[in-house]
UniProtKB/Swiss-Prot annotation:
Similarity-based family: Belongs to the SsuD family.
InterPro entries in the cross-refs: Alkanesulphonate_mOase_FMN-dep, Luciferase-like_dom, Luciferase-like_sf, SsuD_RutA_monooxygenase
UniProt entry tagged with the keyword Oxidoreductase: yes
Designated name of the protein: Alkanesulfonate monooxygenase
Catalysed reactions, as listed in the record: an alkanesulfonate + FMNH2 + O2 = an aldehyde + FMN + sulfite + H2O + 2 H(+)
Physiological role: Catalyzes the desulfonation of aliphatic sulfonates.
Gene Ontology molecular function: any one: alkanesulfonate monooxygenase activity
Organism in which the protein naturally occurs: Azotobacter vinelandii (strain DJ / ATCC BAA-1303)
Gene: ssuD
Key words, A-Z: Flavoprotein, FMN, Monooxygenase, Oxidoreductase
């Protein structure tokens, strides 16, 4: 099975280390453009753009980067409860048309009650999923050419429709991640690709089985993806040293403060991430080559695959054997790590290439020509 590999735009900040301004860099439009263009050239299928009050607006970032990229797809956040589903569908269709069919959408229900209250959303966890289900039914329906009437508990629309359809039919693909039962049911009924954060394979297998069974009861099939950081180096020893350096500036006080902030979240996925590391820098390898260090201070995806190219590829293939076909990866700092992933990891994967990308097993630069006319030996592939 060919794998789809996406990268990540760090609109909330970037740098060499977690928890310190040392080695940090300004994340402005020029820098985001560098990352997007690198991902485009290197053969990543798309980029995830995060959402939340700590991030730049994902829609505006995507719109600004579409003209300076050629094939790259942009996975943009949909926020039920924050915007009308009909307006969101119109925006989605416009972005899809103007990008030439390069728009993907990520349904985000939110997990921080404090942030959600600041955005005017005062719903419980269960109510947010009720509202998200109503939102998604309308959003998918109008994008698919239907005229939608819905009198829901949270949303009511009459005669909702679009005049200008999206390029991707019946609608641009809808991604979604969540770990609660309500999230699994929403995924089974409404979404095209279910994303999980990087838990050990056995836990991921359980989630996939549950979503797959629920989808079957709705007469549907769902694709699966996983969101992971990655630390890949020429040797596994170098990769683990890089992991240690990434959290080398974190002290117990910083970790405790971050974990206290994350503890207010009602996200089941966030609770599962926290359980992997327990707020401690000890015993962070929670599964072979799966490291939970990022989650000590970062909300959301908190685990990384660590190793040399063949080792990380082998772990990815273990997830693929469970049914995962899409990997959304990231690494610090994101510009440099995009090249490391392309050069050290891509040769060991069967990649689904974006349209128009051709290469000799990898899209990254093949090296300097020797003696004016001799091409370097091709990298070993597994």
């Amino acid at each position: 099975m060919s794998l789809n590999v996406f990268w990540f735009l760090p609109t909330h900040g970037d740098g060499h280390y977690l928890g310190t301004a040392e080695g940090a860099r300004a994340v402005d439009h020029a820098y985001l453009q560098q990352i997007a263009q690198a991902a485009d050239r290197l053969g990543f299928g798309g980029v995830l753009i995060p959402t939340g009050r700590s991030c730049e607006d994902s829609w505006l970032v995507a719109a600004s980067l579409i003209p300076v990229t050629r094939r790259l797809k942009f996975l943009v956040a949909l926020r039920p409860g924050i915007i009308s589903p009909t307006v969101a569908a119109r925006q989605a269709a416009t972005l899809d048309r103007l990008s030439g069919g390069r728009a993907l959408f990520n349904l985000v229900t939110g997990g921080d009650p404090e942030e959600l209250a600041g955005e005017g959303l005062h719903l419980s966890h269960a109510e947010r999923y009720e509202a998200a289900t109503e939102f998604t039914r309308i959003w998918r329906g109008v994008l698919s050419g239907e005229t939608v009437d819905l009198q829901g508990k949270h949303i009511q629309v009459e005669g909702a429709r679009l005049l200008f359809p999206p390029l991707q039919q019946p609608h641009p693909p809808l991604y979604f991640g969540g770990s609660s039962e309500a999230a699994h049911e929403l995924a089974a009924e409404q979404v095209d690709l279910y994303l999980t954060w990087g838990e050990p394979p056995a836990a991921v297998a359980e989630k996939i089985a549950d979503v797959r069974a629920r989808a079957a009861r709705h007469g549907r099939t769902v694709r699966f993806g996983i969101r992971l950081h990655v630390i890949v180096r020429e040797t596994t020893e170098e990769a683990w040293e890089a992991a240690d350096r990434l959290i080398g500036h974190l002290d117990d006080e910083t970790i405790a403060k971050a974990q206290a902030s994350l503890a207010r979240f009602d996200s089941v996925g966030q609770q599962r991430m926290a359980a992997l590391h327990g707020g401690s820098k000890e015993n962070l390898e929670v599964s072979p080559n799966l490291w939970a260090g990022v989650g000590l201070v970062r909300g959301g995806a908190g685990t990384a695959l660590v190793g040399d190219g063949p080792t990380v590829a082998a772990r990815m293939k273990e997830y693929a054997a469970l049914g995962i076909d899409t990997f959304v990866l990231s690494g610090y700092p994101h510009l440099e790590e995009s090249y490391r992933v392309a050069e050290l990891l891509f040769p060991h994967l069967d990649l689904a290439r974006p349209a128009g990308v051709e290469g000799r097993g990898q899209v990254s630069p093949f090296g300097e020509v020797l003696a004016n006319d001799i091409l370097p030996k091709a990298a070993a592939q597994s």
